[in-house]
Amino acid sequence: KFGVHSAMPSAQARKLCPDAIWTQGRFGRYREMSTRVMGILETETPLVEQVSIDEAFFDVTPGRYSHESPVSICRRIQESVSRLGITCSIGVGVNKTVAKIASEREKPRGLTVVYPGTEQAFLAPLPASAMSGIGAVTASRLAEMGIRTLGELSRADDARMRSVFGARGPQMIERAAGRETSHVRAAVAREDAKSVSNERTFEHDITDEDEILAAIMHVASLAGRRLRTKGLRGQTVTLKIKYDAFHARTAQRRLPSPTNDEQVFGTAACELLGELWHAGMPVRLVGVGMSGFDAETAEQMALFDAGDEQPGRVRASDALSEVTDRLKERFGDDMVGYGRDLRFRHHVSDTTPMGKSDF
C-alpha cells in the first residue's frame, strides 16, 4: 500500500509510512535460528554454502550424496524448519542463478522447482532485475539498450554487452539463459572435535561452595546439549577453575562409560572441585569439558548397569534431556531449564572453547 518492501533502508520506509509501528529486532535470536537452519541443511548434504545470515545454497544433485529426489529432500527441510516455528522458501534448479530466482517466486514457505530443460521458459518473462547482481543502475543501463527482461538479455549481442559491462557482460547473458556453470562451495570443515566444552565468566567473583557447584552443573548442561547435538558421547570430563586473569587450574576424571548426560558428567565435575578449590577462594570462571569421544551410534551397551546408576533413572534422565533439547531448539535457550540456572542467566559471559589449547 505504501511502497515499503523488504531490504529497504529504514529511513526510506519511515518517509513512505510515517505512522508505521516499529519494533526492535533480536539479532542474537536471529543468529541462533540461522545456525539451527544451517544445521538442518547439513544433515541432508555436506555441500552447504551460506551466503548470508538467512540464505544458503546447497547441493542435492541426485546420486551425489543421496538417490532421493531433490524435491523430497527440500520438502523434508521445510518440515524440519517449520518445527523451529519459522518458514523458509526454496528454489530448485540446475545452477545457483536459477535456484536463487526460483526461491524468490513464492513466499512464504514456497517450493519452486525449475526442471532441467525448462530454464529459459522460466527465466525469459522475468524482469532483468530478478537476477542477482542487476541493481537499479545496471537495470537502467540495460533498459537504455532495449533490454528489460531476462529473455531479451539472453539474446543480447555478446560484443555489445562486453563493450558496456566488460567481462561481466557475456556472463550476464549466460546466466540469463540459464546456462551458468556454478558449484556449491562448502565452508572449510573443521577438524573432528577432540573436545566439547563451555565456560562461564562471572561479573563478580563467587566464593560460596553451593553457588560454585550450581555453576558447574549449569555449564555442564550447556556442554551436554552440544554433545547431543553433535551426536557425541565422551568418557573424560575436565573441570577448569579460574581464580583471576592469570591463575587457572584443571582436573580430569575418566568415567566408567561414554556419556552425554550432564547429570552424570556434571556430577563427576563437581566431585573434582575439591582438587582445585578450598573454602573462601574467589572463583572468576568455571569450565566443563568432555573428551575421549565415542560416536553415539557406536556406543556399546553394558550387560549390567554400573553401580548406582539405576536403569530407570538413567532412562528418565535421557528422556528429560531429549525433551528439554527439543523445547530449547524450538523456543530458545531460555524456554526451560533448572532453577539453579536462573542465577547465571545474567551477570555472566558465555564462551565456547574450540579445542584443548583453549580449554
Where is each model-derived feature located?
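Gly/Gly-Pro- and Ser/Thr-rich, intrinsically disordered tail segments characteristic of DNA damage-repair
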Residues: K1-E174, A187, R225, P311-F359
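DNA-contacting surface of Y-family translesion DNA polymerases
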Residues: A130, T138-V283, A295-A298
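Short Gly/Ser/Thr- and Asp/Glu-enriched loop/turn motifs at secondary-structure junctions
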Residues: V51-E55, G93-K96, L232-T236, M281-L285
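Preference for bulky hydrophobic residues occupying beta-strand positions
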Residues: F58, I90, L239-I241, R253, ...
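Short glycine-enriched loops at secondary-structure junctions
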Residues: V94-K96, G178, S291
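Short, hydrophobic beta-strand segments
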Residues: A56-P62, T250-R253, A302-G307
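Acidic, metal-coordinating catalytic segment for phosphate/diphosphate chemistry
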Residues: S257-F359
